[in-house]
Amino acid sequence: MNTASLVRSLSRVALRSSQVVRMAAPRHFSQSAKVLSVTPELQQALNREIEAEQQLSSDNLQGAVAPTFAGFQVTNKDAEVRLTKKNGSEDILVVFNVNHSVDMDEGFDDEPSQAVAPVPVAMPPFTVEITKGDQRLCFHLELVPVDDQPDEYDFRVEEFYVAPSAKNGNEDVPSEVYASSGKYIDPDLHDLLFVRYLEERGLDARFCKTLVAYATHYEHSQYVGLLDKIKKFISK
């Protein structure tokens, strides 16, 4: 990984920690000191960060080309991503949000001695809704890395339930709907419902890998977009 990647991987952690050190020292202000705006310096810092992030995207995240989900249509609005597909009489909806989906502590040592810093990946929780008629079968899932298989991912069902289908754009689940934890289920049901049933609908290990790749790419683009919005805001 090149220097730009290292900057990207560490910037959200290393810069924050260095700021804490500086803020810990007492600050003495001269009564006669001329008040200077921080804006020019902040603009320069934002430009440097945006340039480093764009270089990382070019080197490691396929630039502006986002991964694609086989069989799904993708729509997004700000931090939210929605995947939809038809499966016979079923309407399948997958929703995830990339806010706070990158664990910046994962893969970093206390001492910054690594020659190659890991590129942080986004692993957002996601929901799956399978709608037939006036009902929908819903799953809340977490992404998990596969042990001893780098860059491979699986999902864990955290919660599942059956709810009325969404009507007139209202996707809220009524509070009286019973939901069960995915941690406590018969092993046979786990294999049939959580694994094979979802695999038949395209929600398998390949889907998980694509979701992580897409979310990482999309979260990164949202972060760069946020920096650019801040730069434009302070320049007004």
Curated annotation (Swiss-Prot):
Q: Is Mitochondrion among this UniProt entry's keywords?
A: yes
Location(s) in or outside the cell: Mitochondrion matrix
Q: Which InterPro entries match?
A: MAM33, MAM33_sf
Transmembrane ranges, per UniProt, are none
Disulphides: none
Q: Does the UniProt entry include the keyword Kinase?
A: no
Q: Which Gene3D superfamilies match?
A: Mitochondrial glycoprotein
Report any one BP term from Gene Ontology.
Answer: cytosolic ribosome assembly
Q: Which GO terms describe its cellular component?
A: mitochondrial matrix
The record's keywords, sorted A to Z, are: Mitochondrion, Transit peptide
The residue span given for the transit peptide is 1-36
Q: Organism's domain of life?
A: Eukaryota
Query: What family does the Swiss-Prot or TrEMBL record give for this protein?
Result: Belongs to the MAM33 family.
What this protein is called in its record is: Conserved regulator of innate immunity protein 3
Tell me what organism the protein belongs to.
Caenorhabditis elegans
